[in-house]
Amino acid sequence: MRVKYFGTDGIRGVFGETLTDELAFKVGKALGEIVGEGRVIVGKDTRVSGDSLEAAISAGLTSMGVDVLLCGVLPTPAVALLTRITRSFGVVISASHNPPEYNGIKVLKGGYKIPDEMEVKIEEKIESGYFPVRSVVGRTKSFREGRDMYIGAVLEIFRDLDLTGEMVSLDLANGATTTTAKEVFEFLGAKVEVFNDSQDGLLINQGCGATHPRFLAEEMKNGKVGFTFDGDGDRVIAVDEERNVVNGDRIIGILAVGLKEEGRLNSDTVVGTVMTNGGLEDFLKERGIKLLRTKVGDKYVLEKMIESGANLGGERSGHIIILDRSTTGDGLITALELMRVLRRSGRNLSDFAKEIPDYPQITKNVRRTERMSLENENLRKIVEESTSRGYRVVIRPSGTEPVVRITVEGKDREEIEKIVEEISRVLES
């Protein structure tokens, strides 16, 4: 069966349109049938629709005899950690970096996003419309101590990191890291300047956060380094002391060098995606580090990491997984690991980042239509000809939006623009 509701990062849509309370209730019942008489940990970001979806999912779960532990506002990686500690299932209600009108449902088990096969199983149960009547009804309970458990775990990981004297600026995207990031940095000794720390559900990701890093670059006043998170806290982008944005590729490059120097980089291998910049690949190759590429999506990065034995991988967007620290992308852990590498080296972030080439790369979204075909002879010729001239072309349907993304990378920006427009015309014709 083709997956109907789940995309590359769970179920996602505009609340009240493609994502409804009715669907959330059914997801809860379907998941509840799989879980049995166990428990599910539920967290959410700050979106207004989060309360409604939380109630609907909880109702579905409890009707199937499952107890629900409500964490309230908590980052996705925090819920993942809690499911790993308790060996249980979890649900995160979040649309990550998307605007406030969107929301989503992510399902976790034992620290990881559930595999495709389990997503299909949930799909099939929803589509069948049949759910057995359970003699036992579950209960919902507050689990606000989950936040403290997560913060405690992060502080234990970085127990030797002393940030005394560091000036750090944080853009919390008015999202889930409002409950964790500032407190952790301050506990480790940093002086913290905070932006966008509201839990008003209408402001999440609005002109701020990891998808708008220029906000922090322009507004930070006191920070020697800045970190900007997305709505659910699984992404992070950095800003250096010269107010330059340091994207996920460059963060991965810095971490790879730091981990290799410590003897912590498994197999001297890093996992990226088809969107990973060629500049990072060249930088790593010069230092004896191999880059493996996979499909876009942190779940696919994780799969390739487990398959290859790598412990570092991620995406340009700031989804970065450090597998000996966390089982999922965790913006806060990534930021702290970067601070640790910088402190050990005694170097500024800008010095490190400038060593990593970032070849010109243009991405354009084209609205996906029913008649649009990626199996197009003219398209194939453009891609082959461009590739033969040293340009890297990636054309892929988005897993979270109804668009096709065209990405072209190379060393001549004007030529890249021409290739992108040529491909756009073919797709739209």
UniProtKB/Swiss-Prot annotation:
Catalytic activity, EC: 5.4.2.10
Positions bearing Phosphoserine: 96
Residues the record marks as active site: 96 (phosphoserine intermediate)
GO cellular component terms, A-Z: cytosol
Gene Ontology biological process terms in this record: carbohydrate metabolic process; peptidoglycan biosynthetic process; UDP-N-acetylglucosamine biosynthetic process
Binding site for Mg(2+): 96, 230, 232, 234
CDD domains in alphabetical order: GlmM (cd05802)
Cofactor comment: Binds 1 Mg(2+) ion per subunit.
Coiled-coil regions, chain positions: none
Cofactor dependence: Mg(2+)
Reactions performed catalytically: alpha-D-glucosamine 1-phosphate = D-glucosamine 6-phosphate
InterPro entries on file: A-D-PHexomutase_a/b/a-I (IPR005844), A-D-PHexomutase_a/b/a-I/II/III (IPR016055), A-D-PHexomutase_a/b/a-II (IPR005845), A-D-PHexomutase_a/b/a-III (IPR005846), A-D-PHexomutase_C (IPR005843), A-D-PHexomutase_C_sf (IPR036900), A-D-PHexomutase_CS (IPR016066), Alpha-D-phosphohexomutase_SF (IPR005841)
Maturation and modification: Activated by phosphorylation.
Function summary: Catalyzes the conversion of glucosamine-6-phosphate to glucosamine-1-phosphate.
Family of this protein: Belongs to the phosphohexose mutase family.
Alphabetical list of PANTHER family matching this protein: PHOSPHOGLUCOMUTASE (ALPHA-D-GLUCOSE-1,6-BISPHOSPHATE-DEPENDENT), PHOSPHOHEXOSE MUTASE
UniProt-recorded name of the protein: Phosphoglucosamine mutase
Organism (species): Thermotoga petrophila (strain ATCC BAA-488 / DSM 13995 / JCM 10881 / RKU-1)
